[in-house]
Amino acid sequence: MKTEISTLHTEAVYSDDYSRRYVLRKLWDDSKPKLAIILLAAGTAGTVMLDKTTQLVINNSARLGYGSVSIMNLSAVLNDYHLHHTEDPENIKVIVEEAKTADKVVFSPGTAKSNNPNFIRLQEQVLLALRPCEDKLYCLCNADGGARLQHPLSPQVQVWNLSPLKVSELVTIPEETEQKPKKKVKPKESKEPQQETPAE
């Protein structure tokens, strides 16, 4: 008979008034790669309780060979599933910092709210902020590469496959207008008429 002992270390980062949860970190093996995932809205899962989404995230992250996962959301406001809040610079800051230290970043808020103006606004804010990390940005898909951009609760992607994601697939990237240095105009040289040498 053999006994295996494993520890699931959990950190939950909240706002001072506990109205927002910025990140939920789960660590079970720090020798393995780190995953970050961005979902829709922060739920009730915390340091002890696990909701179904968190269970699916942990199980699939471990199955794919990761040793930790940082769970974040477009809206950090607890249970803000209708997305009433669209401005949260602190949430954007946390998402970017977690993405920088992750090996892969999964963007997975789902498509159910894709016509919601606040969803569109939040998605744009987050994805534009993640452009420096675009080389490690992915979304969920099924085994055939279809059903992209689904939330982990979608039956089509409850067994994860990861597909590379470009920011430009979901948001319009503003044109970067570079100010070209003005060319220095050289003053024209005045040409004096040559005097003819009189013949001797």
Question: PLM features: residue spans?
Answer:
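Glycine/proline-rich loop-helix segments at beta-alpha junctions forming the active-site rim
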Residues: 79, 84-200
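Residues at the starts of beta-strands that form the adenosine-phosphate
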Residues: 34, 67-68, 104, 136
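Active-site and ligand/interface coordination hotspots across diverse enzymes
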Residues: 1-51, 192-200
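Short connector loops at secondary-structure junctions
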Residues: 66-82
